[in-house]
Amino acid sequence: GGGLMYAEKEVNRVYASRLAKRGYIVVCINYSLCPDVTYPTQVSDVMASYRWVAENGENFGFDLDRVFVAGDSAGGQLAFYTAAVNTSDELKSLYGVSDTGLNIKAIGLISGMFDMKNGVNSALLSCYLGYDYKNSPYYPYLQPEEIIDKSDIPPAYIVTSVKDFLHSASDDLDKLLTEKGKEHMYHDWQLTVNRSSGHITSVAYPDLPESAETIDEMLAFFEAHS
């Protein structure tokens, strides 16, 4: 997460440990941050991590027939976009990345920042793509529909909550995937006695009952597509 501008993998250490306790080998990655780089350097970084997993998985005991990707907020955006790019030669060419050799079975998208074209202000777009961002070759692909139409997006588990400031992004993606006939599951948490109505709750507070339920539901979705 972090809007492509801050945070590091250590922030998700506790969340990753909760996935590991449920029997998964978890690989957390860092990616380059704006404004030190411009988008889509982050896409290249994540694709490189997929390639590393494919090339080194056997040495670490990974089951490469059961690979899943999850991300929250900006990480959710990268999980969605890179999982799509991973299936499309046209998008690989656009983003300047090579084949990863990894078959991603399903993705978990937690409070994702999906529509960067319409859901992000011009100041952030300038940070991501430069001041002339509207003329960037990547600008048309900052909304999910363009990516979906050019790829075979894996089955997606989407979770948000009623007071998530990016709620509309997940809601719109659910509607778009439904319209496109893409397999997915959508969980929209409503108000509860705890904090499950906020942004990235299952990642930030993984031991809340609602968070544990969300994690278990996401992993059950993964298993159903393994």
Write out the residue ranges for each language-model feature.
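Alpha/beta-hydrolase superfamily serine-hydrolase fold, recognizing
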Residues: G1-S226
